[in-house]
């Protein structure tokens, strides 16, 4: 415990606790179960200088190695000055592997106003067969994961729990992994969020885990973003953002030996660029809900997810909940927006190649829908259903310059349609599934 702590060496406390705290007054609490908690009663104010009189930018810095197998590592600091760069700067390694059924734990707490930068490794993975993943908790005002590796993997056991909170901003530029025999749980909470790296909670022989994302403002995902909860049966992904989601990455909830999982994505404004969302399974398709529930949750007493106001999906997007094996029913996909939806891309809920019923797709809006997607719901006489039930609908070309021009104009913000709508009748050039329902009298 000191105003500033810098570790460049090796600290070992297997089955014990390594605690590093920056503050002028700190309370140590023995909370039971061999765990210790630190509370900063008074943070350090003003400058902190090294022995040579040089300004120290970080309250806690670790470029070395901290090891607490079967124990816990706690780094905690609070910011009371605008002078410092980071309250926690983690460029080295912290390992609290789970051993002999004793889960490891890593806690990095930067307080409500501190910046936390992680460019190293955090690891609470199981070390021997049968050891589950441990727990990792990271919290700060701004949390930057810069080519880091955060792992809580199970060794022939369940993955662990990883919770990361950036109250103003969270940037995921390094891999997060809670995979195991069955997947663990990953929770990301942020003011604003960017994802440019894999986030994994895969199950090798059991069910995939869960990834839950909550953002108060906006969420961006580039082509390097991968959210994967695949397993023998698929797990669950939820991305609930208040204002806007712009997605170009991949969401996977595959069932490699069973039914696909579930994917729920919603925000007031949704923009699906070149992204892939796949909840397919070898024995049954899963469920994908983008922007709302069936008919916008019209007949539900309590909505499970908020409705999007606008939704834009380019023709490069692929949304799939099909059966990848010979037997099984196709999945269920809902694409919804209260005000305006423009949906191109490809949607697939086809059943097994030999048996199984076709799946269900609803693409709609409480007001205006422009539709030019390619939708597959059935195979031969094993038909599925495509439901288009907006108040107003425009059927657009499912490819070529029409959909691309419309999507690009809408994405750039020059009016919702930019005058690029195409009024066409359904014909053989439009790729729909086996059955189409148009219901304009629902409202």
What are these regions (language model features)?
Residues 1-443:
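Extracellular and secretory-pathway beta-repeat/beta-biased strand scaffolds
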């Amino acid at each position: 415990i000191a105003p500033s702590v810098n570790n460049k060496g090796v600290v070992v406390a297997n089955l014990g606790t390594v605690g590093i705290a920056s503050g002028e007054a700190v309370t140590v609490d023995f909370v039971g179960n061999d765990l210790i908690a630190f509370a900063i009663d008074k943070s350090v104010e003003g400058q902190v200088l090294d022995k040579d009189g040089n300004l120290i930018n970080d309250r806690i810095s670790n470029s070395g190695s901290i090891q607490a197998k079967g124990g816990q590592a706690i780094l905690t600091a609070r910011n009371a000055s605008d002078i410092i760069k980071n309250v926690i700067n983690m460029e080295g390694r912290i390992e609290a592997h789970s051993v002999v059924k004793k889960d490891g734990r890593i806690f990095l707490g930067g307080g409500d106003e501190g910046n936390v930068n992680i460019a190293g490794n955090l690891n609470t993975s199981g070390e021997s067969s049968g050891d589950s993943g441990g727990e990792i908790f990271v919290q700060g005002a701004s949390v930057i994961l810069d080519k880091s590796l955060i792992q809580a993997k199970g060794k022939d056991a369940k993955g662990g729990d990883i919770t990361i909170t950036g109250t103003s901003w969270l940037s995921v530029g390094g891999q997060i992994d809670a995979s195991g025999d069955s997947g663990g749980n990953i929770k990301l909470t942020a003011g604003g969020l960017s994802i440019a790296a894999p986030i994994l909670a895969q199950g090798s022989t059991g069910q995939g885990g869960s990834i839950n994302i909550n953002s108060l403002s906006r969420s961006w995902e580039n082509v390097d973003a991968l959210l994967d909860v695949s397993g023998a049966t698929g797990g669950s992904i939820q991305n609930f953002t208040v204002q806007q989601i712009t997605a170009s990455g991949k969401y996977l909830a595959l069932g490699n030996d069973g039914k696909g999982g579930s994917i729920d994505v919603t925000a007031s404004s949704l923009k699906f660029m070149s992204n892939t969302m796949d909840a397919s399974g070898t024995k049954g398709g899963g469920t994908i809900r983008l922007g709302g529930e069936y008919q916008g949750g019209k007949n539900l007493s309590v909505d499970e997810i908020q409705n999007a106001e606008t939704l834009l999906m380019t023709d490069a997007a692929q949304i799939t909940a099909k059966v990848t094996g010979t037997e099984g029913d196709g999945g269920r996909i809902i694409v919804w927006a209260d005000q305006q939806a423009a949906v191109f891309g490809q949607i697939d809920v086809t059943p097994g190649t030999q048996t199984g019923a076709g799946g269900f797709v609803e693409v709609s809006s409480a007001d205006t829908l422009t539709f030019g997607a390619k939708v597959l719901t059935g195979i031969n006489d094993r038909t599925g259903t495509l439901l288009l039930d907006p108040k107003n609908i425009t059927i657009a070309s499912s490819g070529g310059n029409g959909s691309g021009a419309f999507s690009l104009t809408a994405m750039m913000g020059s009016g919702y349609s930019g005058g690029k709508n195409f009024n066409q009748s359904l014909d053989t050039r439009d790729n729909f599934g086996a059955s189409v329902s148009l219901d304009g009298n629902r409202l």
